[in-house]
Amino acid sequence: MEAADASRSNGSSPEARDARSPSGPSGSLENGTKADGKDAKTTNGHGGEAAEGKSLGSALKPGEGRSALFAGNEWRRPIIQFVESGDDKNSNYFSMDSMEGKRSPYAGLQLGAAKKPPVTFAEKGELRKSIFSESRKPTVSIMEPGETRRNSYPRADTGLFSRSKSGSEEVLCDSCIGNKQKAVKSCLVCQASFCELHLKPHLEGAAFRDHQLLEPIRDFEARKCPVHGKTMELFCQTDQTCICYLCMFQEHKNHSTVTVEEAKAEKETELSLQKEQLQLKIIEIEDEAEKWQKEKDRIKSFTTNEKAILEQNFRDLVRDLEKQKEEVRAALEQREQDAVDQVKVIMDALDERAKVLHEDKQTREQLHSISDSVLFLQEFGALMSNYSLPPPLPTYHVLLEGEGLGQSLGNFKDDLLNVCMRHVEKMCKADLSRNFIERNHMENGGDHRYVNNYTNSFGGEWSAPDTMKRYSMYLTPKGGVRTSYQPSSPGRFTKETTQKNFNNLYGTKGNYTSRVWEYSSSIQNSDNDLPVVQGSSSFSLKGYPSLMRSQSPKAQPQTWKSGKQTMLSHYRPFYVNKGNGIGSNEAP
């Protein structure tokens, strides 16, 4: 048991201690060291350690050997991890002869390399799952050009966390001989992992009371300094990297250093703050997505109603066109019937005349058949006494006004299409081609939405110069008609011109009751007393109190909060109710 304890205090298990210790010239271990095959034990720790000290001292550079092997007045043996598990080929260790050997994958943490995020290690309890190791769905960036990410920070290396997590499931006990059991804890002092059976001395023995136990660690080399091979127990706040106690007196001398526990607590506080900020952003995005989902439904409902109105109006238009078509058709049929009746009358008259002529012809044929000359002459004289030449046939010309109907309908169709296209284009330019979704620029100075409410209503620009055209639209008396008036004269703001313009704009003509307009002394005085307004005019706002924007303090803006924000709501940006009388809180 004492031998086992001594081996644990030396940082390795009995099985892990092999013939890698430096030997003398004869190839055998000094001071009573026995060698049996490949494995050997040091019977005299002092002699063996002295020999190893010589070999290590020869490999170190001048000036480093003493600082590396001595701390104060006590000589310390460098802790070297020998892996006896199946991963021996992949183990990383330093050669006692050349100090080169296999390099640690964490060699980038040494001084002189580029600064990287600090390597963190698992503490007591379960290994923390990295928040960056989970798979993320691709997201659409909504960050505007020119903006900077407030929560931008270097991403941690997920490989270390994934290796630690996957390795903890396969770490084997370093003290088991033969069939190795699964390790349940790892000791940072012993630099070894133990199963439940071999962990009892650490739990029950007083000599191991100060040993720090953690969840099974697969690679102890990751906790060692790549320069000195010592356990990294300090954190350099200047270079933001883990160091050993030798680095504190050499490469990181005069740097601000703390223990890894203190640095971990500080980083955990920073991480908690970042998580809080991310949670607030998540809540904000969820609320914004919920709002836009409602806007999406509202847009669909609005479009459905507009489509119904479109269908109804065009259905009415088509019905009216069909009605007009039927009326034109009925007119054409009526005109046809009238013309046919007139032709029938003419044809009846012609038939009657033809009948009379046929009768005259038969009479003459009978007269021609008389053989008696006296009788023939008597009958012929009686016939010719009443005979007259038949009148000529009347001439008729049918005026078909419908011969130009095709051209008229073509012109009508072109005119109708032009009117439809003009109105449709007007509607499209007014509504369909407008950008319905605009970003709020309140953070850039000024509530542009508040300005747009007036510009959309009055057709003016808030940034227009201080001219009468800008302010006359707000001077409309109650019951009057709003009129925008702007004189063309450059000197329109002199005393006489201003009064004349206002008399023309708000005169006493019509049904409007006369009103005496009172002007301030700043306008009634001489021109030199007129205050100069920054801009393109010398218009005085003091003369018209109704033009002055209210300087009273604004009411406290209402806030729009979600039920998800019972905590940390003071970080939530509020939506401002602009006081437009509707009472709804609009989102940016």
From Swiss-Prot:
Residue numbers carrying Phosphoserine: S21, S28, S58, S104, S489
GO cellular component assignments: adherens junction; lysosome
Annotated localization: Cytoplasm; Lysosome
Record GO terms (molecular function): cadherin binding involved in cell-cell adhesion; identical protein binding; p53 binding; zinc ion binding
Record region (Disordered): 1-66
CDD domains the record matches: Bbox1_TRIM29 (cd19840), Bbox2_TRIM16-like (cd19769)
Sites of Phosphothreonine modification: T476
Record-linked SMART domains: BBOX (SM00336)
Primary localisation category: cytoplasm
Keyword annotations: Coiled coil, Cytoplasm, Immunity, Innate immunity, Lysosome, Metal-binding, Phosphoprotein, Zinc, Zinc-finger
Sequence positions bearing Phosphotyrosine: Y106
GO biological process: innate immune response; negative regulation of protein localization to nucleus; negative regulation of transcription by RNA polymerase II
Chain segments annotated as coiled-coil in the UniProt record: 259-352
ZnF B box-type: positions: 220-260
Amino-acid positions noted as binding Zn(2+) in the UniProt annotation, renumbered to this chain: C225, H228, C247, H252
PTM: Constitutively phosphorylated by PKC on serine/threonine in A431 cells.
Functional note: Plays a crucial role in the regulation of macrophage activation in response to viral or bacterial infections within the respiratory tract. Mechanistically, TRIM29 interacts with IKBKG/NEMO in the lysosome where it induces its 'Lys-48' ubiquitination and subsequent degradation. In turn, the expression of type I interferons and the production of pro-inflammatory cytokines are inhibited. Additionally, induces the 'Lys-48' ubiquitination of STING1 in a similar way, leading to its degradation.
Assembly with partners or alone: Interacts with VIM and HINT1. Interacts with IKBKG/NEMO. Interacts with STING1.
Name of the protein: Tripartite motif-containing protein 29
Organism this protein belongs to: Homo sapiens (Human)
